[in-house]
Amino acid sequence: MTTMSGYTRSQRPRQAILGQLPRIHRADGSPIRVLLVDDEPALTNLVKMALHYEGWDVEVAHDGQEAIAKFDKVGPDVLVLDIMLPDVDGLEILRRVRESDVYTPTLFLTARDSVMDRVTGLTSGADDYMTKPFSLEELVARLRGLLRRSSHLERPADEALRVGDLTLDGASREVTRDGTPISLSSTEFELLRFLMRNPRRALSRTEILDRVWNYDFAGRTSIVDLYISYLRKKIDSDREPMIHTVRGIGYMLRPPE
């Protein structure tokens, strides 16, 4: 078993123990997104490699300010967070995250190992707490457990979504904004559902094309722009905009400030 200290070196990341378990992925089939926050490059490199074995995408932040910025950008499915960081500590990062996001499962991975440290971490909003040194196998197993219990990953077709005053009911296929019904075509509905499943996250045209159209229009990302324009006319007309262009990337849906 591979055991890691704060700045460990390991011959190999986890392989045999978890290698036979089924892969976990997002409801739309895309990879799990992990935000890993730690200021020790040796540790983040090895953990990132281990999570890549799971088929997950890993974004790394080395300080608190970077973590806060990347959280909104990445929209992670799980957050792995050190407490002792050079600027904003992990407890404060989680406090800020929980102000707007109460669902993303979070695991503290830290050298602070007293009982009081654990209690403080868990009562601050974390879902799990591991201390250094640690095993990569156990870390991966704990993250898999958090993800299995995370309701936003197993989204049924009849799910109900809400972002600000915008609601979408998958069962009745009804959409409202501020209580006003909005009529959408089937494609518009699926596009809006994908945007609402990823609020505050910059989504590329290619990713949207892949998830909504399944490459039926391969290479024609202009179809995304066309349907975004349709949605804007229906969702944002005479209201504060929720669908925003992210220059150089694509689009983001976020509630009015």
Swiss-Prot record:
The modification 4-aspartylphosphate is found at residue 82. One of its GO terms (molecular function) is transcription cis-regulatory region binding. GO terms for biological process: regulation of DNA-templated transcription. Pfam families: Response_reg, Trans_reg_C. The keyword Zinc does not apply. Residues 158-255 bind DNA. Residues 33-147 form the Response regulatory domain. Induction: Expressed in broth-grown cultures and after 18 hours of M.tuberculosis growth in cultured human primary macrophages, but not after longer periods of macrophage infection. Positively autoregulated. This is Transcriptional regulatory protein TrcR. It comes from Mycobacterium tuberculosis (strain ATCC 25618 / H37Rv).
